[in-house]
Each structure stands twice: as structure tokens, then as C-alpha cells.
């Protein structure tokens, strides 16, 4: 008698572990089966369907026996093995599509990823491509991480997401952006193991990383309000490099990312480098990134936070030359000047180099002025072309008119008609003079006077 209750308990445990099959039927005619656990919720079922159909779960509506499924467990709603669910399409009309915020697009793109895609991406086995929508504009972001390797060998075109206090040098990323606004930095973290064909080598320098914001969508909201129109759909690819040894400065770096260089290759296509360290709450006890979409979201969030700290344009050859000259002059001044002399002899070349660097460093205001000047020239040229087009249209219309009543053309007509008969000339002059009476008197030849 005492052994009988143990048998149904084991049976119930086995029954709980066995999944149940659901028949999903859409109103458009699509039918397929989906295997879910017995304790699955409505939200989890919508997430599975959205991952399979590549549709945001907010646009999915499920019906079971004419009842809309909104929340709760499937078993509590009377859904069992072999149940049939109806999938309704979501139709948007009017300006509803423009009301979606950028952070919703990011979250929808991340939530549509399967667990296999997230694991393969974070482990570096395969790249990940996200399609982001901001209003009526699309932007494709390709992310790729390098597989973490043990040992201190030099890794080229790879990077490792590490903890800021326990790992080595922070990773450097090279990015290729697709938009022309602050949101363009979102399409950035795509380091890969193979160099892309559309990317030219750029320089990278180490700087202190800014403080990263928490894992929320507030940064997406703040940057999404002032975005400008994005460019056309251009796929992105990146690569990165990592140093060999760690330094005390790199160990003490705060979690986050910082953009080090930025190059505009073409309208809507950008490349650059940035370095950063993953936040500790996105890592496990061994320092590896967590297999979750929150890790990907943190990387994007750190990049958006880095855009606010990045000011200025990419360093040109002149700027790099100025920095090199200043460093060499300062080193020579410190080596050659005796310690007994005052600081006046050493501060002059350094101050001169600083002024030279200040003049060589391009600023954002200068770029904006150049863009405004180019836009103004384009507008003036368009106005000139439109004015010429109006003049040609007016001349064409005047040539087709049966009579020419413009007073400014009277003298030209009288001079051209001087070879005609005197009767016709006198009639035309008397007729026009009686109507218009221009201020400038026409020159009359002798034949008109005789008539």
C-alpha cells in the first residue's frame, strides 16, 4: 500500500517532462506543429512563434476556441496536447508604423533571435545580422565576435569579451556604419576573424572608456528622438585587433566602450574603431559572456553611450603628423634642457605644438560649415536652373502667341519690318501706338514718313 503513491509520482514527473504538440493554423492558410513544454506560458509560445516566423510577438494574436490568449499558462487555459490554435495577422494602417520607437525595433530584432543564433554569435562561430527599423528607414547591422582562446598569443582580427578587473587588454572593434546620424553608431560592433573587402585600415588609440549606462532602453530612447534620415540599406562588416599583454591601466578600465576613430567612406557608409570592456553583470563566474540577448543589448548600449563622448572627426595624416612632431619636440626639449634652467625654455615648444595641434585638429563646426556651404551651393544652382527653365518656357510661349503686345519689343519689330511695304508699316505703328503708347519712341525711317 505504501509503494502505490510512488508510482503515480514518477509517472507525473515523466508526464511533466514530455512536451505537447500544438497545431498552429493561420488565417492565411499556413499550418505547422509546434512542440512546447507542458508548463509553457502564452508569452513563451508567442516568442517561439515569432522566432519561427521572424515576426515581432507584439503583432501576434492567438485564438483558442474563439478565445483570445493574452497571458497565463497554456494548461490553465484548457490547452493540451493536440490542441488547435488560430493565428491572426496584425494589420497596421495610417501613421501607426511611424509611432514605433527605435528601442522597440531593437528589442524586437533581438527577441526574434533563436537560442542557437545567440549561442553561435557569442561563441564566435557565426555572425549575426539584425535588421533595424527607425520610422521609414531600414538599417542592417552585422555583428560577429571572435572565439575566446586560451593563452597569450597575439590575435589578429579577433577580440575577446573580458571582465575589466580580471582580463587582459580590452578588445578593439572596427565597425562599418549604415546611417548618417547618431544612430549610425548603433551599427558598429561587428568584429570578425576575416578582414572585409570594403574596409581600409585605420589607426586606433587607447583611451579611458566612459562609464557605461545600465542595461535599459533609455539610451535607445534618448538617441532615437533626434535621429536624422538614414541611408539606404547597406550591409555592415567589421574587424578588430587585440593586444598581447595586459597593463595596469587596462585592468582598471571601467566597463563600456569608446569610439576612437571614425571615417566616412561613402554616403551612408562609415567605418571606425572602438575599444571597450563588457559589463560584469553580463558575464558569468568564469568571466565569459552570458548566453543571453542582454549581452548583445549591452554591447549596443555601450556603443550608443560612447557616441555622446565622441566629438570631432577622424584624425587625418596632418593631425597624426602634428601629434608625432609635438611628441618628439617635447621629448627632445626635456632631454636637452638642463635642470637648472627655468620652465620657460621647455614650455615654448610644447605650447607651440599644442597650438599647432589645435590648428591641425579638425572640428565638428568646420565640418558643419563645409556641409552647409555645399548645401547652399546646391540650392543656388538649383534655383539658377529653375530660373533658366522658366525663361526658356516663357520664350517658347511668346514665340507661339499670335500677337506680340509687349512694349519692349516694339522698336525691334519696327526695325525688322522696315523693309516691308509702307502701308503695312504705317498700320502697325498706328495700331500699336494707339493702344500702348510706349515711353521710348520708335525710330521711323524715311519711307514711313512719306507714307
UniProtKB/Swiss-Prot annotation:
Instruction: Note whether Cell wall biogenesis/degradation occurs among the keywords.
Output: no
In terms of one coarse class, where is the protein primarily found?
Answer: nucleus
Sorted alphabetically, which keywords does the UniProt record give?
Cytoplasm, Nucleus
Comp. bias regions, Low complexity: 190-205, 237-250, 336-347, 413-426
**Is Disulfide bond one of the keywords UniProt gives this record?**
no
Q: Where is the Ubiquitin-like domain?
A: 20-94
Family matches, as InterPro entries: Midnolin (IPR039336), Ubiquitin-like_dom (IPR000626), Ubiquitin-like_domsf (IPR029071)
Gene3D superfamilies reported in the protein's UniProt record: Phosphatidylinositol 3-kinase Catalytic Subunit, Chain A, domain 1
Cite a GO CC annotation: cytosol
Q: What is this protein called?
A: Midnolin-B
Species this chain originates from: Xenopus laevis (African clawed frog)
Taxonomic lineage is: Eukaryota, Metazoa, Chordata, Craniata, Vertebrata
Record gene name: midn-b
Amino acid at each position: 500500500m505504501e509503494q502505490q503513491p510512488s508510482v503515480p509520482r514518477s509517472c507525473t514527473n515523466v508526464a511533466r517532462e514530455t512536451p505537447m504538440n500544438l497545431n498552429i493554423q493561420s488565417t492565411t492558410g499556413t499550418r505547422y506543429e509546434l512542440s512546447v513544454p507542458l508548463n509553457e506560458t502564452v508569452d513563451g509560445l508567442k516568442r517561439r512563434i515569432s522566432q519561427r516566423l521572424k515576426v515581432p510577438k507584439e503583432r501576434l494574436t492567438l485564438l483558442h476556441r474563439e478565445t483570445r490568449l493574452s497571458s497565463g499558462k497554456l494548461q490553465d487555459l484548457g490547452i493540451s496536447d493536440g490542441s488547435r490554435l488560430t493565428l491572426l495577422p496584425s494589420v497596421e494602417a495610417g501613421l501607426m508604423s511611424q509611432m514605433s520607437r527605435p528601442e522597440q525595433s531593437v528589442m524586437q530584432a533581438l527577441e526574434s533571435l533563436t537560442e542557437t543564433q545567440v549561442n553561435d554569435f557569442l561563441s564566435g562561430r557565426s555572425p549575426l545580422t539584425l535588421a533595424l527599423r527607425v520610422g521609414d528607414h531600414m538599417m542592417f547591422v552585422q555583428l560577429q565576435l571572435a572565439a575566446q582562446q586560451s593563452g597569450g598569443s597575439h590575435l589578429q582580427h579577433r577580440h575577446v569579451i573580458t571582465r575589466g578587473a580580471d582580463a587582459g587588454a580590452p578588445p578593439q572593434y572596427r565597425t562599418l556604419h549604415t546611417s548618417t546620424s547618431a544612430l549610425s553608431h548603433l551599427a558598429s560592433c561587428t568584429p570578425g576573424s576575416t578582414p572585409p573587402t570594403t574596409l581600409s585600415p585605420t589607426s586606433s588609440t587607447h583611451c579611458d572608456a566612459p562609464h557605461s549606462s545600465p542595461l535599459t532602453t533609455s539610451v535607445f530612447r534618448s538617441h532615437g528622438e533626434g535621429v536624422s534620415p538614414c541611408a539606404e540599406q547597406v550591409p555592415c562588416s567589421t574587424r578588430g585587433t587585440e593586444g598581447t599583454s595586459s597593463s595596469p591601466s587596462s585592468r582598471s578600465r571601467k566597463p563600456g566602450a569608446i569610439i576612437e576613430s571614425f571615417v566616412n567612406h561613402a554616403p551612408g557608409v562609415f567605418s571606425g574603431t572602438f575599444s571597450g570592456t563588457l559589463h560584469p553583470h553580463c558575464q558569468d563566474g568564469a568571466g565569459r559572456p552570458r548566453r543571453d540577448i542582454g549581452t548583445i543589448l549591452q554591447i549596443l548600449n555601450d556603443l550608443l553611450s560612447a557616441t555622446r563622448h565622441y566629438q570631432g572627426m577622424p584624425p587625418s595624416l596632418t593631425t597624426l603628423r602634428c601629434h608625432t612632431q609635438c611628441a618628439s619636440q617635447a621629448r627632445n626639449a626635456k632631454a636637452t634642457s638642463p635642470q637648472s634652467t627655468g620652465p620657460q625654455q621647455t614650455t615654448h615648444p610644447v605650447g607651440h605644438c599644442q597650438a599647432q595641434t589645435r590648428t591641425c585638429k579638425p572640428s565638428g563646426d568646420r565640418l558643419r560649415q563645409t556641409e552647409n556651404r555645399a548645401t547652399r551651393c546646391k540650392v543656388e544652382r538649383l534655383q539658377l536652373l529653375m530660373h533658366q527653365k522658366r525663361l526658356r518656357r516663357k520664350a517658347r510661349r511668346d514665340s507661339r502667341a499670335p500677337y506680340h503686345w509687349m512694349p519692349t519689343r516694339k522698336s525691334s519689330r519696327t526695325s525688322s519690318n522696315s523693309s516691308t511695304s509702307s502701308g503695312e508699316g504705317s498700320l502697325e505703328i498706328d495700331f500699336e501706338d494707339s493702344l500702348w503708347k510706349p515711353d521710348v519712341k520708335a525710330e521711323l525711317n524715311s519711307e514711313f514718313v512719306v507714307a
